[in-house]
A protein has these predicted regions:
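Extended low-complexity intrinsically disordered regions
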Residues: 1-67
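Hydrophobic/aromatic-lined pockets within catalytic cores
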Residues: 61-64, 95-101, 112, 116, ...
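An amphipathic alpha-helical micro-motif enriched in hydrophobic residues
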Residues: 50-59, 78-108
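Conserved small/polar residues in nucleotide/adenosyl-binding loops
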Residues: 133-139
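Residues within alpha-helical segments
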Residues: 34, 98, 109-112, 134
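Acidic interhelical loop/turn segments
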Residues: 64-80
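Short, C-terminally biased terminal segments at protein or domain edges
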Residues: 105, 110-113, 117-132
Length: 140
């Protein structure tokens, strides 16, 4: 992969929103995300962990409001809002992985292998499994 492909032009002024290179895999995303990680290096690991916790809380809060305010119905606007918060979580996960010297693809593959092993052993059921069949999802 050519690191030149990963350059960001966040200061570009044009008719479109800020320009960026679209990513096609997790490691490329991680490299691009790292370019926007602006926090003191002595806060590595701590800063992204706290940020991830906050963003995950925002995801949970939006889902809570679906239950409380929207009669368990998810509309396209809520999908976009939740997706944006998940994107923020992904950024924090990405820079946290980078801070500890891990590639996102390695983490993802190790997790999939762990899940496949659990499935094979018949232990892929977890405790306190929740069913979301009562939610009404938007149709595309």
């Amino acid at each position: 992969m050519n690191l030149g492909q990963l350059e960001l032009d966040l200061g570009a002024q044009s008719n479109e929103s800020n320009k960026y290179k679209k990513v096609s895999d997790l490691d490329m995303y991680q490299q691009v995300a790292k370019q926007t990680a602006i926090y003191p290096r002595e806060q590595a690991i701590i800063y992204p962990t706290l940020g991830l916790t906050g963003e995950a809380g925002e995801v949970a809060n939006k889902v809570k409001k679906i239950i409380r305010d929207d009669g368990n119905k998810i509309n396209e606007g809520l999908v976009q809002e939740i997706s944006a918060e998940i994107g923020d979580c992904l950024w924090y996960i990405s820079v946290l992985a980078d801070d500890i010297g891990c590639k996102l693809s390695d983490i993802a593959n190790a997790n999939l292998e762990k899940l496949a092993n659990r499935k094979e052993k018949g232990t892929l059921h977890g405790s306190g499994a929740v069913s979301y069949t009562h939610l009404t999802l938007p149709t595309n």
